[in-house]
Amino acid sequence: MLDIKLIRSNPEILKKALQKRKDNFDVNGLLSLDEKRRKTLVELEQLRNKQNENSKLIPKYKKEGKDVSSLMEEMKSLSEKIKALDAEVRKIDEELNAILLTIPNIPHESVPMGDSDEDNVEVRRWGEPRKFDFTPKPHWEIGENLDILDFSKAAKVTGARFTFYKGLGARLERALMNFMLDLHVDKHGYVEVFPPFLVHRNSMIGTGQLPKFEEDAFKVSDTDYFLIPTAEVPVTNMYREQILDVKDLPIKHVAYSACFRAEAGAAGRDTRGLIRQHQFNKVELVKFTTPETSYEELEKLTRDAEEVLQMLEIPYRVVKICVGDLGFTAAMKYDIEVWMPSYNRYVEISSCSNFEDFQARRAGIKFRRGLNEKPEFVHTLNGSGVAMGRATACILENYQQEDGSVVVPKVLREYLGGISVIK
C-alpha cells in the first residue's frame, strides 16, 4: 500500500509510475475522495468544538438561572450531525482503503523500461550450458522412465498439474530441501521457521495477494482461510502490527513450505511437467530491513539464492525485471533463471524482490530507531531460495545420461546416503 500523504503531496510521482506500468488508475479521483475526507474531518472538528463549548455553557447558564432549552436543542442537533459525519468519514475511509489496496507499488528508478519479459535486462551469467552428444529428454519423460515421477496417477487422484514423487524422486526432493535449509541457516545466517500452510484473509492482504489476485488463490470454502501461495505470506505476517527494534534489523528468515496456486492465467505456459504446478515445494527467504539498507540486502539475498545453484553446478543467469513485467507489490525484482536443455532456454527458478514499505504499510510492520523516536515502516524483501520442483526438473535435465540415468549433484549425495546415480 502506498502512503496517501505521498500521493497527496506529489501526485505526479504516482501518475508517472502508473504510466510506466501502463495502469490507467484514476489518481485524480482518489485525490478528490481524499479531499472530501479532509473537508468532512474539518467540519466534524468544528462541530465537536461547538459541542464542547456548549457543554461548558449549559451548567454555567443553569447556575446563573438562565434558560438553556435552546442550547439543549442545539446540542441535540449537533449530536445528530456529528453522528452522521462520523459515519460518513468511516465510509470514506473504507472506500479510500479499498482503493489504496488496488494501487501497485512505485517502481524503483533503476527498474528498466519495457513491456514484457522480453525486455528484462540480463545482469550476469554463471556456468556454461552443457553440450550433449545426444538429444536431451524433457524432465517429465526422464522422471517417468526412471519411475520417480508419476503425473498420470496424480491426475487420477487430484487432477492436472499435480505430481507423485516416488522412491528416489521423493528422496531427491527431500534432499534438496535439507541442503537448501542447511546452507541458508548455517552459512547465510537465516533463522529457520516452519510456518502454517493456511492463513486468513488479512494475512493475504498484508503481503499483497488480496484483494487483486484472489482468483489465483485457493480458498477454503465456508471459511476465511486460504492455502498459502508462498511462505512469504505467513513469515511476513509473523510481525504484523508490531514495532521492531532497529538493533534487531535485518531480520532474516528461511522457511520451507508447500505452495498452492490456481495460476488462473497460466493455461498453456509450461504446464507440462514440474515447471507450473498447482502444488509445489519451495524454500523461501524473507528479510525485514531499514529503508536505507534494503537495496544492499536485496543484492545479498539474490546472491544467497544464486549460491544454491552454484553448489548444484547448474548454469543460470540473473535478469533485472522491467517495469512491464514487474509484479504488483515489488519496487524492484531480479529473476534467477536456470538453463533447461529440453527447452533450449533459461527458465525462472527464483524471484528476489524488494517491496520497500509497500507490504509493511499494509501489515503495520514498523521499527523504532530509539526510545523516543517515531516508529517508521520497515522494508520487506523476499526471494525463492529456491523452488524445489523446478530444481528437481533442472537436475534431471542437466545431469541426464544417454542411458536414461541421472547423475546426482555432488553436494546432494550425502543427503541421499551416498547414492551418486539415479537409474
Curated annotation (Swiss-Prot):
PROSITE patterns with a match to the protein in the record: AA_TRNA_LIGASE_II (PS50862)
InterPro entries: aa-tRNA-synt_IIb (IPR002314), aa-tRNA-synth_II (IPR006195), aa-tRNA-synth_II/BPL/LPL (IPR045864), Ser-tRNA-ligase_type_1 (IPR002317), Ser-tRNA-synth_1_N (IPR015866), SerRS_1_N_sf (IPR042103), SerRS_core (IPR033729), tRNA-bd_arm (IPR010978)
Domain of life: Bacteria
Any one of the GO BP annotations: selenocysteine biosynthetic process
Localization terms from the record: Cytoplasm
Keyword terms: Aminoacyl-tRNA synthetase, ATP-binding, Cytoplasm, Ligase, Nucleotide-binding, Protein biosynthesis
Predominant localisation class: cytoplasm
Quaternary structure note: Homodimer. The tRNA molecule binds across the dimer.
PANTHER family: SERINE--TRNA LIGASE, SERYL-TRNA SYNTHETASE
Role, per record: Catalyzes the attachment of serine to tRNA(Ser). Is also able to aminoacylate tRNA(Sec) with serine, to form the misacylated tRNA L-seryl-tRNA(Sec), which will be further converted into selenocysteinyl-tRNA(Sec).
Similarity annotation: Belongs to the class-II aminoacyl-tRNA synthetase family. Type-1 seryl-tRNA synthetase subfamily.
Protein name, UniProt field: Serine--tRNA ligase
Annotated gene: serS
